[in-house]
């Protein structure tokens, strides 16, 4: 993967003509395509394989092909690509040869956000859930925001919406610096930690990129920073120097919007929020985990800065049931509950397992972890292993390569060897097809199984449930 280039001024969305997406099934790409379709633009695209996203976009009028062929770009005016597309893709090359406008995904996102009051949610962890919560809170306030999110909201079942209100909420991707193409009025930064080091090269470069992101916020704008994370707190001086209004949120005693009296349970959480010494009132969530309470506090902090009524935000957040692949329940078989989570960074993994511990309510937590990317596994194997120590039983799968080529010596075994549990509680299982039977053999009634990772581990939930049903009583 490489960094996106600043392509300069991008035409307004209604001047892009027919837009062709290479990799249209991706979370970010499909959301933008959905909004363009809602605005009446002709959209086409391709992807490597069929998916639920492709089916949904076809139903909205998109012309979508499976596979990559230069002929697919015929008739297009603008081609959209992303960092997930390998250099030399035949459709991208054909578009360049034909002199078509070729734009990175984030440039088109910036184009569709133009004219709205843009709000960007950035951070190493928690972006998708926080963006989703913010969209729901704005809806509860009667604002009907547009939004583009890296995951499907459970209620509408989609990752994007072309609203009639003034706000446009977007998940801002730091992995390839594409968030530096956005120009929001306001932003939330959940946390800042080293990640995507295959791209950035160093932790300092990651922090520098987030400081540069502050420079993209409109003059006189607002930034809301996570108070519990050193990386995001460290952005406050730079934000103030830019003249931005700065608010913080979290559990920290000095947070501008502070969580007080947090009570966690299998059913979610209950707490009060305090802002400037004033108690705003109670807030309850049905999504589990301390991290989700913190995410909600960030949403409220930004909402207050925008002048939104707390009571309406609290009502919306109380009804928020989550986003797809964010601690998503997959089912139950023989007394064993199965959940799925997208966590692919040590901090996200720790948060997911902490939530699992509360939801398990005394039962054992069985973690099924698939490392994502060879580079990330190499960089964080020890941290992943340490985080997995919060489970009772651990099954580590082999690395999901995604866009990367294999790296000698880098396998899931590196993670398994770093888990601080007895050897009998940790298993390295490189065969994807063997995992369901392995998990069914380990789990017992009352256990909670959590499949974890950004790869195809998400497809294991139904397989594990079937294996549990088929297991001898």
Range-by-range predicted roles:
Residues 35-38, 58, 72, 83-227, ...:
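Phosphate-binding loop of NTP-binding sites
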Residues 91-100, 205, 216-221, 242-244, ...:
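P-loop/Walker A phosphate-binding loop and immediately adjacent motor/lid segment at beta-alpha junctions
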Residues 41-48, 222-227, 366-370, 390-401:
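Short internal beta-strands
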Residues 385-445:
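C-terminal helical cap/extension that packs against the catalytic core
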Residues 218-223, 361-362, 390, 445-446:
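Short glycine-dipeptide loop
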């Amino acid at each position: 993967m490489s960094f996106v280039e600043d392509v300069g001024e991008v035409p307004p969305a209604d001047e892009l003509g027919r837009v062709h997406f290479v990799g249209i099934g991706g979370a970010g790409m499909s959301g933008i395509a959905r909004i363009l379709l809602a605005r009446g633009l002709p959209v086409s695209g391709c992807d490597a394989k069929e998916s639920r996203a492709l089916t949904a976009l076809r139903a909205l009028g998109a012309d979508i092909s499976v596979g990559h062929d230069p002929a697919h770009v015929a008739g297009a005016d603008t081609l959209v690509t992303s960092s997930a597309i390998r250099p030399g893709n035949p459709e991208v090359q054909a578009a360049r040869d034909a002199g078509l406008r070729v734009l990175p995904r984030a440039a088109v996102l910036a184009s569709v956000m133009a004219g709205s009051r843009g709000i960007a949610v950035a951070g190493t962890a928690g972006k998708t859930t926080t963006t989703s919560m913010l969209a729901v809170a704005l809806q509860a306030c009667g604002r009907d925001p547009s939004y583009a999110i890296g995951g499907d909201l459970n209620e509408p079942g989609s990752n994007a919406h072309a609203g009639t209100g003034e706000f446009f909420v977007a998940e801002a991707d730091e992995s390839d610096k594409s968030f530096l193409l956005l120009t929001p009025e306001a932003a939330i930064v959940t946390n800042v930690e080293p990640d995507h080091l295959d791209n950035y090269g160093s932790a300092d470069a990651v922090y520098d990129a987030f400081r540069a992101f502050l420079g993209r916020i409109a003059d006189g704008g607002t930034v809301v920073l996570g108070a519990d994370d050193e990386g995001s707190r460290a952005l406050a001086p730079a934000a103030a120097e830019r003249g931005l209004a700065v608010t913080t949120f979290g559990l920290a005693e000095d947070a501008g919007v502070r969580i007080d009296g947090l009570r966690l349970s299998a059913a979610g959480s209950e707490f009060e929020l305090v802002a400037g010494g004033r108690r705003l009132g109670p807030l309850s969530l049905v999504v589990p985990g301390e991290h989700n309470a913190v995410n909600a506090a960030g949403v409220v902090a930004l909402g207050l800065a925008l002048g939104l009524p707390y009571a309406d935000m609290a009502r919306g957040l109380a009804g928020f049931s989550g986003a797809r692949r964010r601690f998503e329940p997959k089912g139950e078989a023989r007394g064993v509950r199965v959940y799925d989570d997208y966590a692919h960074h040590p901090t996200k993994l720790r948060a997911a397992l902490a939530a699992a511990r509360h939801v398990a309510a005394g039962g054992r937590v069985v973690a099924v972890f698939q490392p994502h990317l060879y580079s990330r596994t190499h960089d964080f194997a020890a941290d992943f292993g340490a985080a997995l120590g919060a489970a009772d039983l651990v099954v580590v799968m082999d690395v999901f390569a995604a866009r990367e080529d294999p790296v000698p010596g880098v396998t899931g075994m590196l993670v398994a060897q770093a888990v601080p549990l007895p050897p009998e509680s940790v298993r390295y299982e490189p065969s994807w097809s063997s995992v369901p039977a392995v998990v069914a053999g380990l789990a017992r009634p009352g256990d909670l199984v959590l499949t974890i990772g950004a790869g195809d581990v998400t497809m294991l939930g139904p397989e594990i449930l079937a294996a549990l049903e088929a297991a001898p009583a």
